[in-house]
Amino acid sequence: MRSYLDFEKPVAELEAKLEELRALGARDGAVAISDDVSRLESKAAAALAELYATLTPWQKTQVARHPQRPHFVDYCAGLIEEFTPLAGDRSFGEDEAVVGGFGRFRGRPVCVIGQEKGATTEARIRHNFGMARPEGYRKAVRLMELAGRFGLPVLTFVDTAGAYPGIEAEERGQAEAIARSTEACLALGTPNVALVIGEGGSGGAIALATANRVLMLEHAIYSVISPEGAASILWRDAGRAQDAATAMKITAQDLLRLGVIDGIVPEPTGGAHREPEAAIRAAGDALAEALTGLADLDADALREQRAQKFLEIGRRL
């Protein structure tokens, strides 16, 4: 069953009427309703397109968090052949908030790493809602070092509200683990491309997104803190999250204009959750194009391009 966001209520009502008409036609084939169905389909599609063409930053935040939005495991299943996952950080344990391994992307061997939120209650608990602990980032470092050793490109998929802030994570060196993961990204001698597929929250996101090319899905968000967190700090009122989302410039469109990201991957009308397969194909095309654009750079040039890219962001902003 499709899940609707609050601001999608007008579309939800139209699509509910459409389903009623279709059910009526299925029950009684003698009832001529094809014209009514076509008319209502066109009206619902137009309403959806108009709504999604003018989303506010807060509405985009809601879309980025949509429970039916495709997650990393969906992109991995749709894009990576012969995927072989690796587990553990060889130091403390396994963190399923970060999933990674090796496989083939459109015929070429790659290392792929992503943050997984989980699609069911059980999966969300197992993956800790995509909030990685230190061992998750250390696993990512291990994977990136292996990729560098074997000369493989690295694809990272970012989808997290932020790194896990629990006491045990801090005791095991959360800040250091994030820093080491960021350092590993910068030190890679092979191309790396990051794609923000949902939420890109704080250091938990940048630890996997310090890449030669950083892309975002059309309705993804990328920020140093959640809108609710920013509103609580700035105005002592989490209820002003909508104001914070607008002020923070967290959308793909704002960040492309500011030079923080390198490209936007278009989503199907109504968001990636409405047509996951189409969204995954579009993401694959964008990743392939980015890798092709980096193919002629040697290890030193890749490191230099990456470093200058992020230094320039600091100078400009």
Curated annotation (Swiss-Prot):
The record's InterPro entries line, in alphabetical order, gives:
Acetyl_CoA_COase_a_su, ClpP/crotonase-like_dom_sf, COA_CT_C
- For this entry, list what GO says about its biological process: fatty acid biosynthetic process; malonyl-CoA biosynthetic process
According to the UniProt entry, what is the EC number of this protein? 2.1.3.15
List, for all copies, the residue spans of the domain called CoA carboxyltransferase C-terminal. 39-293
Does the record's keyword annotation contain 4Fe-4S? Answer: no
Protein purpose: Component of the acetyl coenzyme A carboxylase (ACC) complex. First, biotin carboxylase catalyzes the carboxylation of biotin on its carrier protein (BCCP) and then the CO(2) group is transferred by the carboxyltransferase to acetyl-CoA to form malonyl-CoA.
Give the record's subunit note: Acetyl-CoA carboxylase is a heterohexamer composed of biotin carboxyl carrier protein (AccB), biotin carboxylase (AccC) and two subunits each of ACCase subunit alpha (AccA) and ACCase subunit beta (AccD).
Name of this chain's protein: Acetyl-coenzyme A carboxylase carboxyl transferase subunit alpha
Q: Which organism is it from?
A: Methylobacterium nodulans (strain LMG 21967 / CNCM I-2342 / ORS 2060)
* Gene behind the chain: accA
